[in-house]
Amino acid sequence: MHIYKTTAENGTASYEIQKSRFIAYTSHVETEAEARDFVTAIKKKHFDARHNCSAWVLGEDSSQQKSNDDGEPGGTAGNPILEAIKQHGLTNVVVVVTRYFGGIKLGAGGLIRAYSHTASLGLEATPCLE
């Protein structure tokens, strides 16, 4: 039997930088369909947000990975969220980071840092189990 670390329940955290508000949502999922359903639910909840970027890691060996920038410049949102999941050593988890644009452009580096930091905050606020 392979032991892996995952989230025990849903979590959330928020972060604000230069008037943009970022909100992370995390959830334990077992399948890609569950991950997609969670992303869809967050998009419906925050239909008025500029972006709802996401990433997930599935499987005991973390072999299934997916990220989505949802209109942000390529590689500035979904991939940093995915990296945060991997840095926390988690699998069977999905993270969605919602962004409400505050009118000030953050640049590629600023977006990467903001999405990564917000995802990490969300994961740190979520109880985990092995």
Predicted segments — roles?
Residues A33-T40, E83, R113, H117, ...:
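Solvent-exposed alpha-helical segments within well-ordered globular domains of core cellular machineries
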Residues V94-V97, I104-E130:
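Glycine- and Gly-Pro-enriched alpha-helical subdomains that act as flexible
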Residues A13-Y15, W56, H88, R99-I104, ...:
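Flexible, active-site-adjacent loop/turn segments at secondary-structure boundaries
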Residues P73, A77, I81, A108-L111, ...:
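Helical mechanochemical/support elements of P-loop NTPase systems and associated helical scaffolds
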